[in-house]
């Protein structure tokens, strides 16, 4: 019996010692934390509401500037670009439209390519992210000014792609596939399904993956990639970088032809059809969690009054 009590007392003493050590250790930690925190100093500051513009990257309003490329020397647009950069000081997005109509039936000259590179270089030294659009028309007359052959459009894509890729850190997204009135992918020799798809996929293969691409309508995107299933787009690293630029935004109930009337509908089997406004917006809600969506508000009307636009 005595041996049992001795062992029991010994065990109690061990447990007590463990608790004592733990308590002492806890006290030491508290002292250390107190000493550490007491060495930190800070200066309090008052805060007040402000209505200043928040220049968040890659979103918000953009300024739009255009260049008609020629065979003149590389620094032809230096003064104009400097003026543009000064004018757009309050925004962080700019849409640069590069008009190639002077070369609509020939390759771009070395001087022309040097001009384009110089323009991008100057903008890359500014705090702006660039939305880029190549085009052949500013007057709604693309059928008269775009190349007579699709091969010339493809040549221009190849010629400009290296320059674009070398400025991928400042070029955020490209709009369109070079063709159509205002490069908005309508009123063109090359907007049949075959030609449109050929140009879009060529551009996709040429442009660095770090730069987003975009097409004018959801119908265009579905037609190019032959699916209305966004989960299929998610499985393809190249396809998922293609967003939308809605240049008919709030111009009418169907955004000036972006959507169809209420009886329009697309399906998995008829992916190349145009849907009504509700169906297309639901499609965009899912797609544009993954890629950018932007565009231009046009035509003053009741749909872009503040109550409706909100």
Place the predicted regions along the sequence by residue.
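Membrane-interface motif at the C-terminal end of an N-terminal transmembrane signal
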Residues: 25-40
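N-terminal Sec-pathway targeting helices
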Residues: 4-23
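Aromatic-lined substrate-binding rim segments of carbohydrate-active enzymes
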Residues: 77-137, 152, 211
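The substrate-binding groove and active-site-proximal loops of carbohydrate-active enzymes
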Residues: 99-111, 140-151, 180-192
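Catalytic-core regions of glycoside hydrolase
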Residues: 173-184, 188-310
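Boundary/entry segment of secreted carbohydrate-active catalytic domains
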Residues: 36-92, 97
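Active-site groove signature of glycoside hydrolases
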Residues: 131-141, 160-193
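An active-site-proximal structural segment forming one wall of the substrate-binding cleft
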Residues: 111-129, 146-173, 194-206
